[in-house]
């Protein structure tokens, strides 16, 4: 159903708009002699209908526009004839309403005596002429309009009796179209602008007369060309340059059609004056952003979720694995976003070392091609450069901070990144001095105040017996790396993050050649991987290389899903523990060191709480910087309950998981009051 819009014609304080409206309505009624001189009959017909029919103009005008590009002059003639038959009643009604609206204004403007040529010449000299200047010389145009009205009524009666004959007589010849004067071009454009004025009146009825006068301050320069605005839904009359070219040019018809189409799609023709700027500003204020900008989130600093060992983002994970952040229960990142927290899921190596993963995390946030460092690559025997990241926070620099939240090994990776940002890599600096070449900004150090908080969930800060006793066995490592080799073929979307070790088939490399090359990789005998870094020895080495930053808020969350056995001091896995962790949970539960036995299936409670060599305290409502704030252990929470990956667990509900993450995110927002360097 097409809408029937009602319009009100605005009255200007000086009467210019009312007189102009009346004149144009008279001139366009019934296609009188003045209208016959207009260029392009198809456009003249549309403008006549537009000016005469206020209530039904949308339906007939759209139909004419659809036929405009596919019909010839004969079709325009037939269309005009049909419209003349209906214009009689409509024209008389509109003329009567227009006379009533403008009765008072016409009395004030009877002193105007300039002819139409003077109007065109004056407006050409001064494009910004006041509306009062336009009033001059319109009296003659009004008289001509009245004559046109009579002629229009007579033509309408003749059209009722003999449409075909009179239609041909009323149509201007091709030669007369070419001789159309500039004033009729002005009338044609003005009719379209008058309708657009009524649209603005409908949207903003409270505009004062002064603003209306500015909006209708027209510029009828003969060299104007219609151009659409790029940033505003308004069309400036100054953009109409070069529109009125010589009527003899063969491309004139297309130019006119394009011009009228653009005028139709525009809200109103205006000049870039104060009134226009005010309207544009209001329109921009009313626009709603579909994607919240940084300032519209609760958190000023983005939250970056960093996965642990054997972690993937959905675009590169094996199909057998669940979504890392939330599993089948919920999408944690998306839920945070929907509740007003800006968050991202980092995509880094699943089996790489903490060092390699930290470098990748830096480029994931900052953007660019991963540079593991010339010295590091030479030391461990893998490629120096890795994949290229687009970057989620390209303006990341001192003073522009992020919240880093790491699950499992992700917490260690975050600590390694913070150390590199603040203190750099001495080996890389010395190597660059000796051998020359480029060095990544990450390794130069002096990049403090880029991290607001560090939060760890079930992180083995001091390593885990699971990696000591099982994960670091040669057989286990061989199986995992073989799987990585298999998924490294060029047709696989799965990415284990070991391409720097050669575990990625090249585009023009056969699979046999790829397997032979992988066998020669240094990965099989290197400690530069996640298996070693998760051992108690590897974690201790990281603890020695890292330190607490006095400008960062640290907090740890720890789970426990074991219970004491009946006849011993050993810990047994709970019934609701994630099934794949039952073996490792029982293995850790019988460790020689009793304090290490209580665990979440993969990580001992004592290892998850804080690094042994760094300061810690119990977490309270008082937020502190530069010290590990240890939250109470969450009983009956296994290693993946923090991220909701166990879909079979009925004890830990979706609502509980959602509440945990909302509380965590709200905590991060509170820390910004303490870590915001702009407020300090």
Curated annotation (Swiss-Prot):
Binding site for Ca(2+): 638, 641, 646, 649
UniProt-recorded name of the protein: Lipase 1
Any GO CC annotation of this UniProt entry: extracellular region
Polar residues bias spans: 125-138, 204-223, 235-246
SUPFAM superfamilies on file: alpha/beta-Hydrolases
Calcium found in the keyword field: yes
Main subcellular location: secreted
Recorded catalytic activity of this chain's protein: a triacylglycerol + H2O = a diacylglycerol + a fatty acid + H(+)
Propeptide: 35-290
Sequence segments annotated as region (Disordered): 82-259
Keywords from the named record: Calcium, Hydrolase, Lipid degradation, Lipid metabolism, Metal-binding, Secreted, Signal, Zymogen
Bias (Low complexity): 148-170
NCBIfam families in UniProt: lipase_YSIRK_Sa (NF047351), YSIRK_signal (TIGR01168)
Localization annotation: Secreted
Compositional bias of kind Basic and acidic residues: 84-112, 224-234
GO terms of biological process kind: lipid catabolic process
Enzyme class: hydrolase
Enzyme Commission number(s) of this protein: 3.1.1.3
Lineage top rank: taxon: Bacteria
Taxonomic source organism: Staphylococcus aureus (strain COL)
Coiled coil: none
GO MF term set: metal ion binding; triacylglycerol lipase activity
């Amino acid at each position: 159903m097409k809408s029937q819009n009602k319009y009100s014609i605005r009255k200007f304080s000086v009467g210019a708009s009312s007189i102009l409206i009346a004149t144009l309505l008279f001139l366009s009624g019934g296609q009188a002699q003045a209208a016959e001189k207009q260029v392009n009959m198809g456009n003249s017909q549309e403008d006549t209908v537009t000016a005469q029919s206020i209530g039904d103009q949308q339906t007939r005008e759209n139909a004419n526009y659809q036929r405009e590009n596919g019909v010839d002059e004969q079709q325009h003639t037939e269309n005009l004839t049909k419209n003349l038959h209906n214009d009689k009643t409509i024209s008389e009604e509109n003329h009567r309403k227009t006379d009533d609206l403008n009765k008072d204004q016409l009395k004030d403007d009877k002193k105007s005596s300039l002819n139409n040529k003077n109007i065109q010449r004056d407006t050409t000299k001064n494009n910004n002429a006041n509306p009062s200047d336009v009033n001059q010389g319109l009296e003659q145009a009004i008289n001509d309009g009245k004559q046109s009205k009579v002629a229009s009524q007579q033509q309408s009666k003749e059209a009722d009796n003999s449409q075909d004959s009179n239609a041909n007589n009323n149509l201007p010849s091709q030669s007369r179209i070419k001789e159309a004067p500039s004033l009729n071009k002005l009338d044609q454009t003005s009719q379209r602008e008058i309708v657009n004025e009524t649209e603005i009146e409908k949207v903003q009825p409270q505009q004062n007369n002064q603003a209306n006068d500015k909006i209708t301050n027209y510029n009828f320069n003969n060299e104007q060309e219609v151009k659409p605005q790029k940033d505003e839904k308004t069309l400036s009359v100054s953009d109409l340059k070069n529109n009125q070219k010589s009527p003899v040019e063969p491309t004139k018809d297309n130019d006119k059609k394009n011009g009228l189409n653009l005028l139709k799609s525009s809200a109103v023709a205006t000049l870039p004056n104060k009134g226009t700027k005010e309207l544009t500003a209001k329109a921009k204020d009313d626009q709603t952003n579909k994607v919240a900008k940084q300032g519209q989130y609760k958190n000023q600093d983005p939250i970056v979720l960093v996965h642990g060992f054997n972690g993937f983002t959905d675009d590169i994970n094996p199909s057998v694995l669940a979504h890392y952040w939330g599993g089948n229960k919920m999408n944690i990142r998306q839920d945070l976003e929907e509740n007003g927290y800006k968050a991202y899921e980092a995509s880094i190596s699943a089996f790489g070392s903490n060092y390699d993963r930290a470098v990748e995390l830096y480029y994931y946030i900052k953007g660019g091609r991963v540079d593991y460092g010339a010295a590091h690559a030479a030391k461990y025997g893998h490629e120096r450069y890795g994949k290229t990241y687009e970057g989620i926070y390209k303006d990341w620099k001192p003073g522009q901070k992020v919240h880093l939240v790491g699950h499992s090994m992700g917490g260690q990776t975050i600590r390694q990144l913070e150390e590199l940002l603040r203190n750099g890599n001495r080996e890389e600096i010395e190597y660059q001095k000796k051998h020359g070449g480029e060095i990544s900004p990450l390794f130069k150090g002096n990049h403090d105040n880029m991290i607001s908080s560090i939060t760890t969930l079930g992180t083995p800060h001091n390593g885990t017996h699971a990696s000591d006793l099982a994960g670091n066995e040669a057989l286990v490592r061989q199986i995992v790396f073989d799987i990585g080799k298999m998924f490294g073929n060029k047709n696989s979307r799965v990415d284990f993050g070991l391409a720097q070790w050669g575990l990625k088939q090249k585009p023009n490399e056969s699979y046999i050649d790829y397997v032979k090359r992988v066998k020669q990789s240094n990965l099989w005998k290197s400690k530069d991987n996640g298996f070693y870094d998760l051992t108690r020895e590897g974690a201790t080495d990281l603890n020695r290389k890292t330190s607490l930053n006095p400008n960062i808020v640290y907090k740890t969350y720890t789970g426990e899903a074991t219970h004491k056995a009946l006849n011993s001091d050993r810990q047994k896995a709970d019934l609701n523990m994630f099934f794949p962790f039952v073996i490792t949970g029982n293995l850790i539960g019988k460790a020689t060191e009793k304090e290490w036995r209580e665990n979440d299936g993969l990580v001992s409670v004592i290892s998850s709480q804080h690094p042994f060599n760094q300061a810690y305290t119990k977490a309270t409502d008082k937020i502190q910087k530069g010290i590990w704030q240890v939250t109470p252990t969450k009983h009956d929470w296994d290693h993946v309950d923090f991220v909701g990956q166990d879909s079979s667990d009925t004890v830990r509900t979706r609502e509980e998981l959602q509440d945990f993450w909302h509380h965590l995110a709200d905590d991060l927002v509170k820390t910004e009051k303490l870590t915001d360097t702009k407020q300090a």
